[in-house]
């Protein structure tokens, strides 16, 4: 995270990565979602034998060229989540229970791609708008960053 801050490189935080982004910038986490939210929506199974589950995630702001309220079904597997959002981050996607599922830096000029998602895009079905668009925008920003570094 220190490297990303110093060099303003593209950063995609997945699951715990989103949680690290939030805590690094001063936010807090729910320590155990079933106790806090009263739901097992985000991780199926028992505490000793958990497994992936799926649920919907919807955008609450325009992001990555997607319209407001774009929804995808994503793979989820976590028992912690954002409680207090860090200063400098903004929420762009949420689960039906209100848990924050997508964040980005507020300063998109300094950090063109500093985005975290609580779900697992690498295990979610292709063709889901949030999954596809997050990946495509990350790759686009990474290629632009590589071009900037190569021209130095």
Question: Can you annotate each of these PLM segments?
Answer:
Residues 1-7, 34-152:
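Amide-donor transfer/coupling interface in amidating biosynthetic enzymes
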Residues 2-28:
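Catalytic nucleophile loop
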């Amino acid at each position: 995270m220190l490297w990303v801050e110093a060099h303003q490189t593209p950063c995609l935080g997945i699951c715990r990565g989103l949680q690290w982004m939030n805590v690094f910038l001063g936010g807090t986490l729910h320590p155990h979602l079933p106790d806090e939210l009263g739901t097992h929506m985000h991780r199926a199974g028992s505490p000793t034998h958990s497994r992936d589950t799926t649920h919907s995630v919807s955008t609450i702001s325009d992001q990555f060229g997607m319209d407001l309220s774009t929804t995808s079904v994503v793979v989820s597997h976590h028992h912690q989540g954002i409680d207090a959002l860090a200063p400098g981050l903004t929420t762009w996607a949420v689960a039906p229970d209100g848990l924050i599922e997508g964040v980005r830096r507020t300063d998109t000029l300094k950090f063109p791609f500093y985005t975290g998602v609580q779900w697992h895009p690498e295990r979610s079905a292709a063709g889901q708008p949030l999954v596809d668009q997050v990946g495509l925008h990350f790759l686009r920003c990474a290629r632009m960053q590589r071009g900037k570094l190569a021209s130095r």
